[in-house]
Amino acid sequence: MASGRWASPGPAWASRRPLQAQVVLKSASPGPAPASQQASSFGSAPAQLPPAFVDPELSPAMLLSPTCLPVACTGPGLAGEQPLQAPLLPPRGISRPSSGLTAASRDQVPACLPAACVRPSSSVTVACSGPTHASGTLSRGVSPCLTLASLTLREFSVGPCLTLASLTLREVSMSPCLTLVSLTLRAILPHAGLLRPSSCLCWPFQAQPLPVGGL
């Protein structure tokens, strides 16, 4: 009898086994979380996202973007400080009073007046070594910005080439930028050995104006 009971547990034991299995399943998988926990978990999800995706208007990428671009990144058109190029003089070598040649510091413009090979029938382009050098020869303590308001060019030709004879300085205005109303340089090029009757004249011209006190 006893051995028969242990061999066949009976219907009572068979009915208890599913109940124990259900209890084990309940303890292993607690089921869906409460609504409050779901809300808190979903509410905290945006806080864990990167700051750029939380709010586009307040993202660091928008806040750190510069409202004004640097001069080096922008082009000369946007920066407003584009280096001015020296305009060519008329073919006859006489400039108009309204034409001005402006140059700033050496960092902005490499040469205030570029040099060129001068011919009688072509336009004349005067050059100098740099704005700081030109302003240093004129006066001490003057800003390196050099503005040429008007140039008076007098030329004569020796053989096939043009010789720059004189460039006269008449008025000098001492301001933060040195303004030359009209500049005249009296340079005798054959004296320096730079001019030959049979060769074209090409030289890096350096302006050496007259002293201010002597005018």
Swiss-Prot record:
What is the annotated signal peptide range for this record?
none
Q: Where is this region: Disordered?
A: 25-48
**Record field: compositional bias (Low complexity):** 27-47
Q: Which Pfam families match?
A: DUF4705 (PF15788)
Superkingdom field: Eukaryota
Name the record gives this protein: Putative uncharacterized protein FLJ46235
Taxonomic classification: Eukaryota, Metazoa, Chordata, Craniata, Vertebrata
